[in-house]
Amino acid sequence: MKHAPGPGMFFAVLFAVASCGVFAAPSEASNDGRIAAQSPCSDCIRVRVGLPRIARGPAPDIADNRFTEIQLPDGRFRGFDAHGDTHAIDGDHPWDMGGPARTVLERGKPGTYDSCGQWLQHAEPSGSTILGFVHNETACRYEAGQTHKSMSLAISSDYGLSWKDLGQVITGTDAATAGKSTGEGDCTFLNGQDDYYYAYCGRPRDGAVIAARAPVSDPGSGHWIKFFQGKWDQPGLGGDATSLGKGLGSSGARWTANGETVLLGWQRGGMGLFFSNDHTTFASLHEPLLVLDPGIWKRPDPSEVLAYPVMLDARTGGNQLSNSWMLVYAYWPPYEGREQKYLVFRQVDVSMSNAPVTPQVGVLLARWYNPALHDRWSTTAAVPGNYSPYKLETQSGYLMTIAGAGKPSVELEDCVSQRPGHPDHLLAEKGFCEAHTYQRLRTAGWVYAQAQPDTVPLYRCYNDRDQSHFASNAPDCEKLGTAERLLGYALKQ
């Protein structure tokens, strides 16, 4: 999962499936014929993306896998973070993953299929045993864009503190090649509750996402079968597989409310949710889950980068999802270098209505306050130093991830200036930041231009004493400053 340096542009959501180790999502949602089947009333799904919480970082050697975790017999949780080696972290809650890390998987011996590292991608309880699905790399020369990927199965009898390798379960059709990323890997695994485990994997040679499955009764080496040309009939070891469609990522889960498989992926404007009722044919939610601007993998850069996103259940930490999810991802803030990397957990609440809902997706706008910097920061993004030194002050409604359908809306940007001698974060209309010499950080989202049912006003305010802008739902700016203008109307809930 290491990535070769290079000047090329990558979009801000990255999925580890392409030739250099990451998949740069296209600028348009694309469809090659496989992404076609519709979920029952996909327009009836309502999603609210909540507060981001930074659990680990900054550090360069974290968050290089799809984060995975299990619940322990005592009710606590054990998460697994990887960066060549895999580390176990214990916490009281699924998102409480800031504690000490201990190494549980290491790079293999020279010449082995895991000589460059073992990244635990998914931990699956099976009785008192934990199944570990491990991403491996060998023949790596990361500075030249070269590595060779595969997946193996390991088991643990002590809840992930030690592992026994049972061998490879998924390999590609190609061999290690100088200057190229080859093989198949970066898989996530889920129990389809139909007697099969399903794997969704990246194939670097063509940027494809592919599927394989194995019986729950025996998911070991030689029992995985890939999906190829409409059938499950190609061996997991060395067999061919059909691409499931452009725009998909390899981060999968199962939504227990309807039994559907859910993949994260890319659609126009941001990170998307894709649903399937047959494990192989996916349809996207019409609105992005998160708004994401184009980003640059090579750091530092003015853009931000989200990588290795995965969905976990907010109560159990597994990937059998209730209606309360966590979106977990690696994060590089704008203008920061590679060493400023964070692991972020974000609440996502999902529900199904009996009729179509508009808008479907809303992302929480939170306001943080750092008294030492005299900075109030109204943002939809993760805030380095969240909870200390930045304290959560209030929540100001939800921003839409696309322009309001059929109704005038306003696109808002998140930006910052250092002119007062400290950060002055500003939420403003698109174009305002550059016109007023603020550094643009990101697209924050959209608000309605006029009041709509279940919306709240959103004002841009200014505190003259602190020389700090902020957003508020109150016309008197909660007596923290004075209103400069009405930005629009955010979703109330």
Regions found by a protein language model. Give the residues of each.
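Extracellular glycan-binding segments that recognize GlcNAc-based cell-wall polysaccharides
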Residues: T358-Q493
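Secreted/luminal cysteine- and crosslink-motif detector
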Residues: G21, S42-I45, G117, R141, ...
